[in-house]
Amino acid sequence: MSDPDAPSSTGDSPTRPNGPRPNVLACPSPTTARFILLVVATLATGLFVGVFVHNMVLGDRWQREVVACASGLPYAEAEGADVLTTWQAWAECTADAEHRRAIFAFAGLAVAAVAAFVIFKRSPRRLERRRRLRPADERFAAARQRFTELSHAAGLTRPPTLMIGPATQRDAFSYGLPGSQRVVMPVAALIRPQCPEFTALAAHELAHVARRDVTVAWAAKSIGYAVAPLLLVPALLAVLTGELSLLTDYVWRAVLLGAVVTLTRAAILRSREHDADLLAARMGSSVPELSAVLAQMPDMRSRHLRHLIANHPYAHRRIAVLDNPASIARASFVDAAAAAFLAGLMPYLIDLVVVPLLTGTAGVGVTDLVAAAVMGPLVGATIGLASWRACLVSRVSGAAVHRGPVAAGVLVGFLLGEAASLAQYGPGGYHPHPSPLLLSVTALSAVGATVATVGLGELWADAAGRLPSARSFWLTAVLVPGLLFTATLWAAMKVQKSLEWGGWGMASLTLTDYFARPTMVVGTLVLALAAAWPIWLARRDTVTPAWLLESGTGRSWPATDRPAARFTVIAGLLAGTCGAAVIAVFRALAGAAADDAQAAQRLYSYVFLAGAVAAAATITVECFWPGRGAGAALISAPVAAVTAMAGLVVINTLLGGTLTWTFAYDIGRQPIGLALLSQTFALSIVAFLPRGRRTSRRIGLAAIVVVATLAILAASAVITARDVLVPIAAKSIASGEPRPLDEDVACGSCRVIGPVTGHANRQYW
């Protein structure tokens, strides 16, 4: 969550900046996406509680059934064992036990959802009884009339119900369910409906209603009340069953999850207050009136972390935001860390449901895709909206956009979230404790996706002057980062699980084979188009879009840096060409492959080489086009990878191989998905380096030398390490007769060579 309540670095009495006033409400704040993330995390906690109850009640039975299934399997330790058949037999045998566990998990999810809904539904009545609230009667007819006028000014066709409390009440607030929302005003303000204080308070609360965030606020509070009892259930069961040794491992996870939920909920409530202040200043009240009312409120200037859990921002901070709205258009470390932490909890928890539910079916392998499809759009929308809005508003305010704190927050959040995942705790847990090295795979890929998201935000901010409305910008800010995080996290989780279950041999196969699927290829190409389109739109100067200005005159909106944009493609082509040159030199020195096993090793090594030159192009583009280069690398990375493999096709043809469209397509698409993962890992390396201010004049010979040098070094390193990167263990193959894929199964640390066996062009690799 962004930290809008942190003390200002420029003092507590900021002055309004000269120039136009940006309309920061043109783009939605990340509040809604963050709220959805909070809801999903709460439901995921319910999943865990359901599984934990199953393990405590039926854990022994589940263990006996699973052990019986395992003991009946025909394990073979010899090289070439039919692992796939063994796994399928085990899945079919344990299907009933796993389905039973899935039922418990869904029951826990239902309990979490019902508990939060009941608390939310009963909150208005309980609040009215506790605070003695009642509708304003005829004594306040003038106030009701003025309130109705302000409601129409706020765009509300049906004014909310005006409520009052006891005479001692000093605060105004809004509450209620959808369709029956109410606004509470202090009696002292109601008796003077024409005074600025009444106008400011009423306009602020009506802004909440107009923005439809009253439901979000009270639902967020209800979720907080529902999470605490849920987290107590496992601890209570452990005490009742005498499993006290489990408490130590559980308590720190529960406390950490509870703390993050509390921080996220508080951030949702704080950010909505700033949004309501800014909207109220434009519909019935004004900045001076609101500032005067806020100045009369009790203020706290905590130098500690107390402001992070406050539901309302401090008065001095609200005044500062009214004076300078651009100050809230940013994403912070805490914002990114909270979103990443909640997302890091989800994959293993989703596994606990999806794996048992699909055990015994052909769809059991989609668990990573389901997890990525759930958390990718949520994290992408949260970080994308915050960072893209910051990039956009910075064009008007002149403030710098800092990606380092956001990237650091994502790194810390994912590491803590994965390590604290409740799915790793409890008897009969599905996943073991992975090592920190394995956890870092997904975390680093998320960092790279974050840097690329900020880079895309810079590119689309350049093109904002050509967009017809704010909606065109913020919808893209939701969809494109969501796709980027979904694809990146799915790939990273696939690699992480491959390392965990089968070591580097399985991970190597995943990296070079699995990511060549059409879905990954199409996703990578769509992301490249999402980076190319704003560069094309921003090819000419324009002016500040009217929808981005609240007041003031628009300024010149500079076009994108054309030499840098051209270098994006040039860097990819040059890096790929250097990679192809390394392949040609290696083929000339090493000669033809001795057998099918060596041919397979070479082919998959070339795929790794394509990923390596994609990383080289990414680093170069980001270094010579700081900020925007991270987004533009979505173009240069696949261009570099495809160019390198196109070089392989040319070499194959020159040596006498057969050139067909099928062969060219199969070879060309092989590294595209890997290029995306290589790009994110490369960006994670440069994420925390200071960004320079290089201009187009410096993109010349130096840039060409750098990209060529990096590409040659990376490609040469892959060729040198091919025995490590692509371990091969092939059976003897009858000459002249290609063997089916399932007859060439590698050992646990080696690779399947079936796709290469009998290939017409294998002798030219």
Walk through the language-model features, giving the residues of each:
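Hydrophobic or amphipathic, alpha-helical segments that drive membrane association/targeting
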Residues: 2-163, 226-250, 254, 258-270, ...
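Active-site-proximal gating segments in proteases and membrane effectors
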Residues: 152-182, 262-271, 275, 280-339
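Active-site recognition of the HExxH zinc-binding catalytic motif
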Residues: 185, 200-208, 212-213, 217, ...
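Short pre-active-site segment immediately N-terminal to the catalytic Zn-binding motif
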Residues: 187-200
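Solvent-exposed, extramembrane regions of membrane proteins
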Residues: 205-209, 311-312, 320-325, 594-600
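Post-HEXXH active-site segment of zinc metalloproteases
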Residues: 212-242, 290-294
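Extracytosolic and intramembrane catalytic regions of membrane-associated proteins
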Residues: 741, 746-751, 755-765
